[in-house]
Design a protein with these regions (language model features):
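N-terminal Sec-pathway targeting helices
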Residues: 10-32
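Penicillin-recognizing serine hydrolase domain
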Residues: 399-433, 437, 492-638
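Boundary regions of SH3-family modules and the immediately adjacent low-complexity/disordered segments
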Residues: 321-324, 372-401
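Short aromatic-glycine-enriched beta-strand elements
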Residues: 366-372
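Extended, compositionally biased repeat/scaffold regions that form elongated interaction surfaces
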Residues: 34-335, 360-365, 381-388
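Short, well-structured active-site flanking segments
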Residues: 461-479, 499-501, 547
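SH3/SH3-like (including bacterial SH3b) beta-barrel domains
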Residues: 339-355
Length: 638
């Protein structure tokens, strides 16, 4: 991350609660370390040092410090954990507000696990730490001296979310995990030794002006007094600029990092045959690594927080998961449900907000956590395993649609669609249950006469804006365009609305993307089946047109001449009300494009469907496909 490189310019004299139960005043001393060893020049920046009372011991000036700092045990990482691709990870909805408001991208990085239910609450791990949403009544020990998972955690009063840096737990355990890369010469056990109180340094002494060439600046953070004088730690200016940047520490460096617990410790790490020189420094709420072999966008050495999230999981293993059978959960994005975790065969493909039910058992694999789940739709049900990282136990907002592949509705229908390849696409919206089923939903297809629907809606929106109803001639054009699919009538109305630009403006105004009107021929406009379903959904839900014009549009689409009905119209269940429009035309390649779209209502059940085909040798081939898909959906959803 790029940060501005600046010296501290303000005196901060707020009280700070120390890790050993004493209040330390924080004083900053800017020092210049010259090329002569141990010779420095001090420049106090108007700071005030607050008294520490009786803390004067010379070797370990702060007795009662974290007892684990003097420990000798080490912990060898045994859990195999692979960090997922950031594109496949999601910040759980329960943490999104905190993550956005608290600079989560900088302070925490990407999610590397899902938010999982534990004994104490919901826990999600990130690149640089973790977030905890405690259960009511849970006892959470945030004291830095605890050396546990929650040590040095920072609670947000607005959301009750606790940010966990994890570094304290890794230091306390003496994790043998390498710091700053798999081949690093430094481990957390080494950092623990470097963080002991006897590593505090005295305030650097003054040297003559003759040694003032080629200085490198440091900031001295005062911790207290010993018999040798003021003691604390030196922070290199590059690291100081990083931790004090508003991007890195939106709540201020004292809150987001706290005082240093060590000096900046040199290390090396080999990457792709190149030796990288590192500086690692421990703070109360984070560990910072400067890699002098990499640069940021300003060309300066790259500085980041340490990847404590993955290091914690590899050292301690995953947290104990507490999932109750029959607990509802929802998909966060596209993911499969497999027969077995990791390597199983896909059973269904689910998408955002798709509802699932936990079976109660879980499985940790190298790729992460998997939940055993079951699903049920109008046409299918089953059980399998889904990656927990792509799920949430937080219900989506009311009215949010759910998404899935056709295999979640009917494996047989999904298999049929797959056999048609990329020249076929289908989208169904089960309005009654708020569920989309899709196959090749974003493919672009020639609209043919289905373009007459957006022409009609654009025209009626225009007359509404003009404060009038269609005149007799316009009503004739509308009727023959929709009911008889008359192309001359469609051309007349297309010209009257202003052609392709006007239709594009209408579609943009109602938020429908994916339909591209063709200025040279409306019939060769293109659409995605999803866009067509979304446009029909807006008509069905009254999001376009006033009530009178909406009734007119439905009346026209419900009275299509029999010779213009196939697909939706030919296969609708008995007693269904169908508002529809089909289309077919030879494409530029002289192969047929054919489609069928409509709104079908049977009693209390309503679904909206669009099936598009193209590059078919015979028109009958397109008819057969639309009949098969529309008929199968009608049997499943009506």
């Amino acid at each position: 991350m790029a940060t501005s490189k600046k010296a501290p310019t303000a005196v901060e004299t707020r009280w700070w609660r120390g890790t050993w139960g004493r209040r330390f005043g924080v004083a900053f001393v800017l020092t210049c370390l010259w090329s002569v060893p141990l010779l420095t020049v001090n420049a106090w920046i108007g700071a005030h040092a607050y008294s520490l009372g009786n803390a004067h011991a010379t070797s370990t000036p702060f007795t009662g410090a974290k007892s684990w700092l003097s420990g000798a045990r080490t912990t060898t990482p045994t859990f195999s954990f692979t960090v997922p691709d950031a594109r496949q990870s999601y910040v759980d909805p329960m943490f999104k507000a905190y993550y956005s408001a608290s600079g989560g991208a900088q302070a925490l990085g990407s999610a590397i696990t899902p938010a999982v239910p534990t004994r104490d609450g919901w826990l999600q791990f990130f690149t640089y730490g973790a977030l905890l949403l405690p259960k009511a009544g849970a006892t959470i020990n945030l004291a830095p001296s605890s050396g546990g998972l929650y040590a040095a955690g920072l609670r947000d009063d607005k959301t009750n979310v606790i940010r966990l840096p994890l570094g304290e737990a890794l230091l306390a355990s003496g994790s043998a995990s390498p710091v700053g890369g798999d081949t690093s010469t430094l481990t957390y056990a080494d950092l623990r030794v470097a963080s002991r109180p006897n590593t505090l340094v005295t305030n650097p002494v003054t040297v003559s002006a003759a040694n003032q060439q080629g200085a490198q600046s440091n900031v001295f953070i005062y911790e207290g007094q010993s018999s040798a004088g003021a003691v604390g730690h030196l922070v290199p200016m590059d690291i100081w600029s990083y931790i004090t940047s508003a991007d890195t520490s939106p709540d201020g460096w004292q809150t987001d990092f706290g005082n240093p617990m060590s000096e900046a410790i040199p290390a090396t790490s080999s990457r792709q045959g190149t030796v990288h020189h590192l500086l690692v420094q421990v703070f109360w709420r984070g560990i910072v690594v400067e890699d002098r072999g990499l640069t940021d966008s300003d060309g300066d050495p790259l500085i980041t927080r340490l990847n404590t999230g993955a290091d914690y999981l590899r050292t301690f293993g995953p947290p104990a998961i507490s999932v109750t059978s029959q607990t509802p959960l929802w998909a966060l994005g596209d993911s499969p449900v497999l027969t077995t975790p990791d390597t199983g065969s896909p059973l269904v493909h689910i998408g955002q907000n798709f509802p699932l039910t936990a079976k109660g058992d879980v499985s940790w694999t190298k790729s992460g956590l998997w939940y055993h789940v079951q699903w049920k739709t109008r046409g299918s049900h089953g059980e399998g395993w889904t990656p927990a990282l792509a799920t949430t136990f937080t219900a989506p907002p009311a009215g949010s649609p759910a998404w899935a592949g056709f295999d979640a509705l009917s494996p047989d229908l999904a298999s049929y669609l797959n056999s048609q390849g990329g020249n076929t696409s289908a989208v169904v919206y089960d309005v009654t249950r708020g569920q989309y089923y899709t196959y090749n939903a974003s493919g672009q297809f020639i609209m043919a006469s289905s373009a007459k629907v957006p022409i009609m809606l654009t025209f009626l929106t225009m007359t509404e804006a003009q404060g009038r109803e269609p005149n007799d001639n316009e009503m004739y054009l509308l009727t023959t365009m929709i009911e008889n699919s008359d192309n001359d009538s469609a051309q007349a109305l297309f010209d009257e609305i202003g052609g392709a630009p006007a239709m594009s403006n209408f579609l943009s105004s109602v938020g429908v993307n994916g339909i591209a009107p063709d200025p040279d021929g409306w019939g060769y406009s293109t659409t995605t089946p999803l866009a067509m379903v979304q446009l029909l959904t807006m008509l069905h839900k009254g999001k376009v047109l006033n009530a009178q014009d909406r009734a007119l549009a439905f009346n026209l689409m419900e009275n299509i001449e029999p010779d213009q009905q196939t697909g939706v119209g030919d296969t609708a269940p008995n007693g269904a009300t169908v508002a529809m429009k089909d289309g077919w035309v030879p494409g530029p390649d002289n192969l047929w494009a054919m489609n069928s779209s409509g709104i079908v209502t049977v009693g209390s059940e309503t679904y909206i469907i669009a099936v598009y085909t193209q590059h078919e040798n015979e028109l009958q081939d397109g008819w057969n496909i639309t009949d098969h898909v529309c008929g199968a959906v009608g049997q499943l959803l009506a």
